[in-house]
């Protein structure tokens, strides 16, 4: 008889926390794909990021709860482009690609889909596959953040905004300073739906200070 795999204490604790989490239960009741929806809902209620008619790019979109919030808040009047290494099941009003944001063909898809149209809001909830080596994982995470920031600066409208998930610790201050150089206003948000024990916070940048030339990417 095959032996059942042992469940670690940390795995059991995570599972218990997950199934008893009020936001997990609420997401199931409200039809959202994950509890992360409430992070964006709370930030939007404070900062008024989403409006009908916008073009939104969601990086690290799977399973799609932020896309759901965006479509809902925009009343299906606008565009939502979603990218993730994992598949995003079809959602009305969302154009999704399963791909690696760091790969040239993924960026080419974005550029071709946008067709030189500027973006109102870039969302990034990206995180690397964790190796368990903290410094390495943090470095890889901020590499993704920097790529998302570069995309945002190049494609946002002058009054656009960039919301990115970051983790406080190594690399945080350097990235926040990069955000401050790129945007007129940068604030930190820690929504209630973020677990207290997590170092996760969100940086919100508004109004790019200087839109870099994007002639090479095909935008005008």
UniProtKB/Swiss-Prot annotation:
Keyword vocabulary terms for this entry: Cytoplasm, Methyltransferase, rRNA processing, S-adenosyl-L-methionine, Transferase
**Binding-site residues for S-adenosyl-L-methionine, renumbered to this chain:** 64, 66, 84, 100, 125
Q: Which domain of life is it from?
A: Bacteria
Record's subcellular location: Cytoplasm
Has keyword Coiled coil?
A: no
- Quote the EC number: 2.1.1.166
Q: What is its main location?
A: cytoplasm
- Which range is the signal sequence, renumbered to this chain? none
Q: Kind of enzyme, top EC level?
A: transferase
Q: Name one GO molecular function term.
A: rRNA (uridine-2'-O-)-methyltransferase activity
Taken from the UniProt entry, a GO cellular component term is: cytoplasm
- InterPro entries in the cross-refs: RNA_methyltr_RlmE, RNA_MeTrfase_FtsJ_dom, rRNA-MeTfrase_E, SAM-dependent_MTases_sf
| Substrates-to-products reaction catalysed | uridine(2552) in 23S rRNA + S-adenosyl-L-methionine = 2'-O-methyluridine(2552) in 23S rRNA + S-adenosyl-L-homocysteine + H(+)
Show the active-site residues.
165 (proton acceptor)
Q: What does this protein do?
A: Specifically methylates the uridine in position 2552 of 23S rRNA at the 2'-O position of the ribose in the fully assembled 50S ribosomal subunit.
Q: Identify its protein family.
A: Belongs to the class I-like SAM-binding methyltransferase superfamily. RNA methyltransferase RlmE family.
Checking HAMAP family in the record gives: RNA_methyltr_E (MF_01547)
Which protein, by its recorded name, is this?
Ribosomal RNA large subunit methyltransferase E
Naturally occurring in which organism (per UniProt): Thiobacillus denitrificans (strain ATCC 25259 / T1)
């Amino acid at each position: 008889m095959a032996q059942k795999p042992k469940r670690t204490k940390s795995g059991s604790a995570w599972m218990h926390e997950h199934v008893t989490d009020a936001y997990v239960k609420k997401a199931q009741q409200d039809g959202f794909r994950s509890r992360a929806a409430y992070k964006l809902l709370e930030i939007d209620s404070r900062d008024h990021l989403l409006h009908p008619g916008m073009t939104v790019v969601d990086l690290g979109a799977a399973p799609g709860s932020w896309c759901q919030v965006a479509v809902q808040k925009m009343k299906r009047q606008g565009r939502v482009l979603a990218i993730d290494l994992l598949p995003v099941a079809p959602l009305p009003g969302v154009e999704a690609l399963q791909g690696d944001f760091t790969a040239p063909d993924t960026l080419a898809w974005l550029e071709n889909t946008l067709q030189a149209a500027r973006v109102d809001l870039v969302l990034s909830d990206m995180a690397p596959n964790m190796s368990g080596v903290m410094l390495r994982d943090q470095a890889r995470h901020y590499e993704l953040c920097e790529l998302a920031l570069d995309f945002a600066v190049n494609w946002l409208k002058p009054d656009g905004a960039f919301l990115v998930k970051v983790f406080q610790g190594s690399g945080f201050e350097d990235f926040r300073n990069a955000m401050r150089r790129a945007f007129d206003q940068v604030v930190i948000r820690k929504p209630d739906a973020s677990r207290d024990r997590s170092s996760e916070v969100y940086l919100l940048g508004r109004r790019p200070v200087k839109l870099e030339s994007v002639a090479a990417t095909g935008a005008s």
